[in-house]
UniProtKB/Swiss-Prot annotation:
Biological process (GO), any one: translation
Any one cellular-component term (Gene Ontology): ribosome
Gene that produces this protein: rpmH
Protein name: Large ribosomal subunit protein bL34
GO MF, one annotated term: structural constituent of ribosome
Family: Belongs to the bacterial ribosomal protein bL34 family.
Keyword Flavoprotein: no
HAMAP family, A to Z: Ribosomal_bL34
Composition bias, Basic residues: 1-19, 33-44
Length: 44
């Protein structure tokens, strides 16, 4: 059986990267929450 996780850096950035987070209101709220928490890395 094929494994479900097939890593790809391009796909990772497209779905979870900083630009994609900034493009939606919900994504911006995620970044704000991570800033508030003091995360070193905000996104992939």
């Amino acid at each position: 059986m094929k494994r479900t996780f097939q890593p790809s850096n391009r796909r990772r950035a497209r779905n979870h990267g900083f630009r994609s987070r900034m493009s939606t209101r919900a994504g911006r709220s995620i970044l704000a929450a991570r800033r508030r928490k003091g995360r070193v890395n905000l996104s992939a």
